[in-house]
């Protein structure tokens, strides 16, 4: 009977011992101080934060007095080891100290002389659990706390120090195993009678612990985003409900991943690091963005797959997850898996009207110079001819005097009246006679020369001949030959409109041509537009003005949907996204039907994990090895090659089907004709239009000349009739 009572009270006594801390009397305080000093030194850090609060379980004054003595002794020994320490008696100041260290990415080690239950909730609520923060709880009892009573969940790093006997201390660590069960495991111990700590450093490194996950299962959000993930949704219910973000509701939505670059990457990581993964549907089937409540953005809450990471319902997230400052506040990123750039896609430059082909060789910047050359050529030619006549003028004695209409020769008068008439000779400026209407002739001569019309030599001077040769060479070998060569190239390769490949051209097209810009909802490209400066902010304002009734009408479910929108005839649409994603989706519909812009900005994609993720270092090591060995690039190229093979197979299949169908064959033939087309008279219709316009203008001028001649004849006839009447009246 007593034996059974003893067995029944044994669990109770163990629990009581487990929840009770030992008190120190006599030399126990110095032994404890020495042990804790050696334990802290085993961490190989130079600073320590100490939180010393009155314990609720040990509230008697004796223990409080002994603890003060212990704390003083511990600080004295710690400072002898050249350690920096700061002691807090208020939890708020202690939490602020940890937050400041985390913001500066500094490792912070804390020694807490209080019960864990009173601080764990605050540590989790304030997101102070991080791989850079280590919390040492001096438990003081023989056994560590039971996992049913206290659970130290990841990413919180906790060390619990127990005292099984005098001068002996055991160190338990919650991240000694990679299985994420938050159970404490013995990793080291201290024996004051022997050599002190068993091993240094005190704790196993995260790289060694998380190098092998030993079959641990991770939850990975996923949504359809080729070429990164090809997803088939087994449950098509897409409505939002109150329990949509709960883990149970998400796991019920089954998804099936059929391929993708990041799917292959995840399989390779799982094989190398020995873990399993389970795909869950990302809420909203998006990466995630900041929630908007009452028009105000909440920086502490995200939607989509990032929201699952932030709430701890997922372990990591792949699929072209772009890095941004806003996202770094909620999650962390690994070493980048893709170095990409931002870009946008539009339709391919359309073929211009062939009727204007004869005018296109002279671009807009050439026409002013050509017109000015033709305008000033005539006056320059006139100046070259007229200048010699002006230079050869000289003063000579004038022999002729004018008296009204009479001309008097002074030499003759001197001969018939010698010594009677004394006149002084008058000097005048004499010159050779300039050709009649020289300026008009020079203008028409240059015009006929540039227009390749027949014309005679205007002047026989060597200067005029030299300039005529220069004009003829310019008109024949420069203008005519260059024009002919460019016109031939225009006929061989039909001209197309200027491509929209810069942000400035896209902005001009949205303002003047009514283009619409689309972006994937809750993506990093959308964040770039919302938080960007200059042109990005202006483009975002233009996007919101596209659809007045629907301010969010510029959202698309995926980049693939946007490319499909352009392929179905959206000639006035553009899609913004990652260049690699755009390039991959463009191949599905034919790259010759789309135009990719220049690189707008550099963007990086990486594996997203929870803040303070303990295995981020191990994951980075594997990703860096894959990057340095070129495996990531090979995986991307393999995904592209696979897509090309599928596209080619689809085209061959469609070609065989269209060969049997005359209508489909005619469509294929018309499509091929837009790529390479032979020279035909349609390309020369511009010349016939110009000839028709010239003939019409000549006919109009001829009619006007006839009309004006008849009017002049009528006026002359009326004038003659009036003169005859006047003569008749005078005679009468």
From Swiss-Prot:
One GO term of the biological process aspect: detection of chemical stimulus involved in sensory perception
Transmembrane segments: 370-390, 466-486, 689-709
InterPro entries per record: Insect_Ionotropic_Sensory_Rcpt (IPR052192), Iontro_rcpt_C (IPR001320)
Signal sequence region: 1-19
Highest rank taxon of the organism: Eukaryota
Changes seen on gene knockout: Response of sacculus neurons to changes in humidity is abolished and consequently larvae fail to move towards their preferred humidity.
SUPFAM superfamilies documented for this protein: Periplasmic binding protein-like II
Major location category of this protein: membrane
UniProt-annotated glycosylation sites, renumbered to this chain: 18, 235, 299, 531
CC annotations in GO: membrane; plasma membrane
Extracellular side of membrane: 20-369, 487-688
Family as reported in the entry's similarity comment: Belongs to the glutamate-gated ion channel (TC 1.A.10.1) family.
Protein name: Ionotropic receptor 40a
Organism: Drosophila melanogaster
Lineage: Eukaryota, Metazoa, Ecdysozoa, Arthropoda, Hexapoda
């Amino acid at each position: 009977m007593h034996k059974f009572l003893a067995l029944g009270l044994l669990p109770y006594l163990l629990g009581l011992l487990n929840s009770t801390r030992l008190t120190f009397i006599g030399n126990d305080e110095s032994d404890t101080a020495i042990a804790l000093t050696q334990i802290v030194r085993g961490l190989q850090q130079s600073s320590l934060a100490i939180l010393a609060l009155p314990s609720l379980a040990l509230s008697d004054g004796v223990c409080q007095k002994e603890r003060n003595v212990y704390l003083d002794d511990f600080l004295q020994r710690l400072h002898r080891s050249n350690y920096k320490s700061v002691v807090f008696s208020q939890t708020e100041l202690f939490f602020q100290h940890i937050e400041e260290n985390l913001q500066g990415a500094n490792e912070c080690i804390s020694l807490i002389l209080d019960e864990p239950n009173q601080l764990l909730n605050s540590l989790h609520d304030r997101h102070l659990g991080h791989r850079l923060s280590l919390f040492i709880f001096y438990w003081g009892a023989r056994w560590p706390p039971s996992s049913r009573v206290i659970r130290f969940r990841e990413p919180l790093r906790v060390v619990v120090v127990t005292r099984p006997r005098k001068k002996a201390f055991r160190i338990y660590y919650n991240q000694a195993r990679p299985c994420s069960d938050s159970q404490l495991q013995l990793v080291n111990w201290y024996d004051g009678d022997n050599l002190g700590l068993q091993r240094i450093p005190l704790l196993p490194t995260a790289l060694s612990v998380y190098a092998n996950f030993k079959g641990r299962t991770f939850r990975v959000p996923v949504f359809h985003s080729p070429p990164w993930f090809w997803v088939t949704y087994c449950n098509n219910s897409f409505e939002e409900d109150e329990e949509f973000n709960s883990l149970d509701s998400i796991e019920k939505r089954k998804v099936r991943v059929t391929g993708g670059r990041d799917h292959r990457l995840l399989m390779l990581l799982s094989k190398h690091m020995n873990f399993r993964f389970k795909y869950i549907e990302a809420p909203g089937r998006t990466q995630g963005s900041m929630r908007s409540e009452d028009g105000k953005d909440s920086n502490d809450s995200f939607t989509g797959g990032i929201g699952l990471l932030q709430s701890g319902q997922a372990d990591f997230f792949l699929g072209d997850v772009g890095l941004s400052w806003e996202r770094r506040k909620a999650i962390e990123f690994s070493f980048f898996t893709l170095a990409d750039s931002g870009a946008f896609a539009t339709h391919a430059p359309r073929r211009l009207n062939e009727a204007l082909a004869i005018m296109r060789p002279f671009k807009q910047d050439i026409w002013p110079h050509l017109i000015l050359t033709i305008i000033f050529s005539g006056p320059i030619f006139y100046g070259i001819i007229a200048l010699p006549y002006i230079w050869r003028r000289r003063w000579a004695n004038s022999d002729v005097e004018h008296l009204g209409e009479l001309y008097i020769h002074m030499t003759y008068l001197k001969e018939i009246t010698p010594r009677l008439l004394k006149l002084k000779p008058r000097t005048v400026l004499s010159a050779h006679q300039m050709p009649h209407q020289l300026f008009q002739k020079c203008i028409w001569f240059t015009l006929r020369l540039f227009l390749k019309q027949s014309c005679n030599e205007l002047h026989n001077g060597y200067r005029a001949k030299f300039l005529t040769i220069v004009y003829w060479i310019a008109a024949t070998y420069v203008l005519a030959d260059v024009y002919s060569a460019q016109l031939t190239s225009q006929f061989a390769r039909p001209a197309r409109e200027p491509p929209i490949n810069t942000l400035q051209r896209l902005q001009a097209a949205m303002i003047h041509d009514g283009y619409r810009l689309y972006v994937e909802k809750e993506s990093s490209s959308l964040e770039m537009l919302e938080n960007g400066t200059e042109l990005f902010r202006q483009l975002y304002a233009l996007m919101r003005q596209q659809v007045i009734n629907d301010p969010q009408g510029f959202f698309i479910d995926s980049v693939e949907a946007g490319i499909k929108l352009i392929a179905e005839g959206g000639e006035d649409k553009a899609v913004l996204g990652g260049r690699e994603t755009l390039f991959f989706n463009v191949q599905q519909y034919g790259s010759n039907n789309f135009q990719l812009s220049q690189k707008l900005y550099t963007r990086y994609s990486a594996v997203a994990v929870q803040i303070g993720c303990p295995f981020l270092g191990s994951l980075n090591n594997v990703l860096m090895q894959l990057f340095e060995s070129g495996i990531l690039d090979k995986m991307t190229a393999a995904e592209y090659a696979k897509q090309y093979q599928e596209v080619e197979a689809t085209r061959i299949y469609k070609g065989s089907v269209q060969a049997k169908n005359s209508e489909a064959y005619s469509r294929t033939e018309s499509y091929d004709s837009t790529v390479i087309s032979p020279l035909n008279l349609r390309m020369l219709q511009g010349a016939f239009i110009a000839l028709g316009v010239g003939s019409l203008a000549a006919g109009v001028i001829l009619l006007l000349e006839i009309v004006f001649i008849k009017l002049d004849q009528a006026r002359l006839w009326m004038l003659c009739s009036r003169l005859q009447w006047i003569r008749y009246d005078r005679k009468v």
